[in-house]
């Protein structure tokens, strides 16, 4: 599924904890309600990114896996 995004975070080739650390910074700079697409190759993001969203109140709109690449669409919570 294709979602129009406001920003993209490419964390390919990075391992835990770097993708989530980068995600935290990128979401902070995103406008409330903005949609961020995250591209990652670290399998631990399947666990870490959904937990990140729940913990901070952001919406995990969708997640997909394509040949070892993990894709996430995250909507930043309203202030």
Curated annotation (Swiss-Prot):
According to the UniProt entry, its GO molecular function terms are: sulfur carrier activity
A Pfam family (short name) is TusA
InterPro entries in alphabetical order:
Sulphur_carrier_TusA, TusA-like, TusA-like_sf
The cellular location(s) given in this protein's UniProt record come to: Cytoplasm
> What CDD domains does the entry give?
SirA
- Gene Ontology CC entries for this record: cytoplasm
Q: Does the keyword Cytoplasm apply?
A: yes
The residues annotated as the active site are 16
List GO BP terms, alphabetically: tRNA wobble position uridine thiolation
Q: Which PROSITE patterns match?
A: UPF0033 (PS01148)
Keyword field:
Cytoplasm
UniProt family annotation: Belongs to the sulfur carrier protein TusA family.
- PANTHER family assigned: SULFUR CARRIER PROTEIN TUSA, SULFUR CARRIER PROTEIN YEDF-RELATED
Q: What's this chain's function?
A: Sulfur carrier protein which probably makes part of a sulfur-relay system.
Q: What is this protein called in UniProt?
A: Sulfur carrier protein TusA
**In which organism is this protein found?**
Pseudomonas paraeruginosa (strain DSM 24068 / PA7)
Which lineage ranks, top first, belong to the organism behind this chain? Bacteria, Pseudomonadati, Pseudomonadota, Gammaproteobacteria, Pseudomonadales
Gene name tied to this protein: tusA
